[in-house]
């Protein structure tokens, strides 16, 4: 049965073109980088690698066109595949930091948002990305399900997301 699953995965892999395969491989290693940093390195030492956290993204007069959004969604979808097939489960923070790095590298400067909610007396934290005000890696209603943290101790926020 395991061999059948491997063959099926390999067949799916063959559907990607070279550019997509490169992005998939690159995303897998970027996930590895962020997982290592979050898991083993003090936040203050890797904080500088994130250029903005929870700051409002303005359009600077730009409009988001369909071609940009299509490319952004394709990058996110491929990175989600890499995250699902990683050596361990990648949570929302690792996904967002990986996707942010992939998108920034291609000139799409997106914002990282951090939010919390209380569910059954437990504090739940979540992160998502937006590009020019549009949520790009989560459902549109994420900001109604989580209270976004605008000003808070980043150390506390990231510790909760670990």
Where are the model-predicted features located?
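Hydrophobic/aromatic-rich core segments of domains that either
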Residues: 78, 97-159
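Charged/polar, low-hydrophobicity segments characteristic of intrinsically disordered regions
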Residues: 61-67, 140-143
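N-terminal accessory/pre-domain segments preceding catalytic cores
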Residues: 1-62, 71, 78-88, 148, ...
């Amino acid at each position: 049965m395991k061999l059948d699953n491997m063959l099926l995965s390999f067949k799916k892999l063959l559907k990607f073109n070279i550019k997509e395969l490169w992005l998939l491989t690159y995303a897998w290693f970027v996930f590895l980088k962020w997982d290592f940093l979050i898991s083993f390195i003090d936040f203050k030492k890797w904080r500088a690698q994130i250029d903005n956290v929870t700051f409002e993204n303005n359009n600077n007069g730009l409009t988001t066109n369909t071609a940009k959004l299509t490319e952004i969604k394709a990058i996110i979808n491929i990175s989600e595949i890499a995250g699902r097939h990683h050596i361990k489960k990648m949570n929302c923070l690792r996904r967002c930091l990986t996707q942010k790095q992939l998108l920034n590298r291609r000139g799409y400067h997106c914002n990282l948002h951090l939010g919390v909610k209380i569910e059954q007396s437990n504090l739940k934290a979540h992160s998502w990305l937006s590009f020019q005000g549009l949520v790009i890696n989560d459902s549109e209603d994420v900001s109604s399900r989580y209270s976004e943290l605008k000003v808070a101790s980043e150390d506390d926020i990231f510790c909760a997301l670990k």
